[in-house]
C-alpha cells in the first residue's frame, strides 16, 4: 500500500454493469456509496488504482500523475498534461451508453429504408462502428481547478477508467462530409476547416457541430450568411449532420454527437 492505494495489473475483459435503482432503494444506495470502494483503471498504463473507500477526484488525478512519472519519467508526465482531453468513464453506467448506441443504430437502419437518406445512413453507421464508447462523466479534470473549488472535487464511489491525453495538433472532420484529419491552426475557424471538403447530398451546408476535446459540443453557423467565425481547440471534432430541420433527424443527429464525445480515445 502507498498513499492509500495499491497498483494491480489490469486484467483484460473488464465487464461493467449499470445499476438501476427503484425509488425505495435510493436511500440505501446513498448509504452504501459512503462505504463503496473506488477502482480507477489508468488506460494509459494498463493499471488499476484501488482505494478501500470513496476517494476524491483530486487524489485520483494526483496518483495518475505520480504513475506517469514512475512509468517514463518527467517527460511522460509533461506529455500527458492536456487536461482538456482527459476522459473519465464511469464503468457503472456503461449500460446507458450501450443503450444509446443501440438506439442510434436502430434509427439509422430505419432511416436507410428511405432512399433519399440511404447513403447518409450508411456513412454514419460505418462511422459509429469504427469506435468504442463509454459513459463519459461531464467533469472538469484540470487538477488546478479541482484543487481550488470544492464542488469540482467530488467523491468517486464505484468503478471508473481514466484516459489522460497529450495535445494533438489536428482537427477531425466527421459525418456527412469527406471524413479526414486536418492540421490544427490558431488562424483557422470552423468554416476554414470545412472549406476544402465536399459534403454529401444530405450534409448541412450552413451549420456544423464542434465537439471539444472535453466532450462538450455546440452547433455553430459556418456559411457566408451565418458564419460565427468560431475557432476550435486542438484535438476537436467538426461533425456535419443532416441538412434538414426535421425534429426526428435533429434528435438523431444530437445523439450521434453525444456518442462521438464519448469515444474511448
Locations of regions flagged by a protein language model:
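Gram-negative bacterial Sec-dependent N-terminal signal peptides
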Residues: 1-29
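Ser/Thr/Pro/Gly-biased, low-complexity, turn-/loop-rich segments
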Residues: 2, 25-265
Amino acid at each position: 500500500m502507498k498513499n492509500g492505494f495499491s497498483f494491480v495489473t489490469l486484467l483484460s475483459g473488464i465487464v461493467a454493469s449499470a445499476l438501476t435503482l427503484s425509488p425505495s432503494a435510493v436511500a440505501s444506495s446513498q448509504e452504501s456509496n459512503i462505504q463503496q470502494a473506488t477502482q480507477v483503471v489508468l488506460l494509459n498504463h494498463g493499471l488499476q488504482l484501488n482505494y478501500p473507500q470513496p476517494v476524491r477526484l483530486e487524489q485520483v488525478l494526483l496518483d495518475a500523475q505520480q504513475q506517469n512519472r514512475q512509468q517514463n519519467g518527467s517527460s511522460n508526465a509533461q506529455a500527458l498534461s492536456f487536461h482538456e482531453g482527459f476522459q473519465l468513464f464511469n464503468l457503472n453506467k456503461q449500460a446507458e451508453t450501450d443503450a444509446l448506441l443501440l438506439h442510434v443504430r436502430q434509427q439509422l437502419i430505419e432511416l436507410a429504408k428511405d432512399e433519399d437518406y440511404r447513403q447518409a445512413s450508411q456513412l454514419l453507421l460505418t462511422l459509429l462502428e469504427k469506435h468504442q464508447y463509454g459513459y463519459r462523466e461531464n467533469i472538469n479534470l484540470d487538477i488546478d481547478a479541482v484543487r481550488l473549488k470544492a464542488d469540482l472535487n467530488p467523491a468517486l464511489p464505484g468503478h471508473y477508467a481514466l484516459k489522460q491525453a497529450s495535445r494533438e495538433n489536428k482537427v477531425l472532420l466527421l459525418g456527412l462530409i469527406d471524413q479526414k484529419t486536418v492540421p490544427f491552426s490558431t488562424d483557422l475557424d470552423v468554416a476554414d476547416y470545412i472549406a476544402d471538403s465536399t459534403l454529401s447530398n444530405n450534409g448541412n451546408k450552413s451549420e456544423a457541430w464542434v465537439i471539444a476535446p472535453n466532450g462538450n459540443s455546440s452547433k455553430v453557423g459556418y456559411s457566408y450568411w451565418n458564419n460565427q467565425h468560431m475557432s476550435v481547440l486542438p484535438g476537436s471534432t467538426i461533425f456535419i449532420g443532416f441538412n434538414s430541420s426535421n425534429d426526428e433527424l435533429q434528435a438523431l443527429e444530437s445523439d450521434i454527437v453525444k456518442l462521438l464525445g464519448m469515444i474511448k480515445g
